[in-house]
Amino acid sequence: MNVFLWVVAVFLAFVFLSTGLLKLVRTKEQLAATGLGWVEDFGPGTIRLIGILEVLGALGLILPAVTGIAEVLVPVAAIGLALNMLGAMSVHIRRKEPTLVVMTGVLAFLCAFLAWGRLVLVPFS
């Protein structure tokens, strides 16, 4: 189970690091042009904040475990990212984007599973 939790953590870290960095380096218009229509509902500052939170969450999924420092931050980061994805789900529900509702729901589930796994199943010592 420990290996599986690591695989989930690395996958989620990759997803959130890449999407978070995109939100930080591209303008709102560039993001909208790539098909991220939800950005029209938010200001540039909010989009940047989401990007910052995703990058920090991605780092929080890996760095504490790798360094052995404050390992409790791994499930905390996972819970934060799960909450972020629940917010994203509500946006996609409102915008009637069922594919994105499912995708963000799967990410929220994986984040919650990782948090549960690291808090209950295989906690760090």
Region spans (language model):
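Membrane-interface extramembranous regions
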Residues: 1-125
